[in-house]
Amino acid sequence: MGPGRIERFWLDTSLILRLLTNDPPELAAKSLEVFRGAEEGRYILRVHPLVVAESFYTLRSFYQVPKQEVSQALRALLDRKGIEVLEEEAVYLALQEAGSGGLSFVDAFLSHSAEAFDDGVATLDEKLAKRATKNLP
């Protein structure tokens, strides 16, 4: 690491889930400490779209949180200072669409990623095929 370069850490789903669910409280407190460190500028937390997808799915399926609430909570968390989201535009659009529409986060992310490259989507999923600008088969 060169002088003046801030350290970066890749964020794992476990920290997101603990912070958003407060389950269990002692791990939620540790997670909050990690996020505070990023907010204070001690380091940057990088978030991969796969981590967002796993978080969305787990909050919906295991914790039974309504999709709109999941979308809003994840967006608020990702908007915090010190957070760097990879493929940010596609992630945010997918959160919005998955929170309000009929597509899963992964399908919405795939669709928005394909559009960003002016590509199509190869799928047998009817909902995704209808959403995609171009598709196969």
Predicted regions and their residues:
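Acidic, PIN/NYN-like endoribonuclease modules and their adjacent C-terminal/linker elements
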Residues: 1-8, 80, 103, 111-137
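Short, well-structured N-terminal submotif of metal-dependent ribonuclease cores
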Residues: 1-47, 62-69
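Short beta-strand scaffold positions
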Residues: 11, 46-47, 85, 105, ...
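Alpha-helix capping/helix-boundary segments
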Residues: 15-16, 51, 90, 110, ...
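Residues that scaffold the ATP/ADP-binding catalytic core of kinase and kinase-like folds
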Residues: 18-20, 58, 131-132
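Hydrophobic helix-cap positions at the C-terminus of alpha-helices
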Residues: 37-38, 77, 97, 113
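Acidic catalytic patch
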Residues: 46-51, 71-100
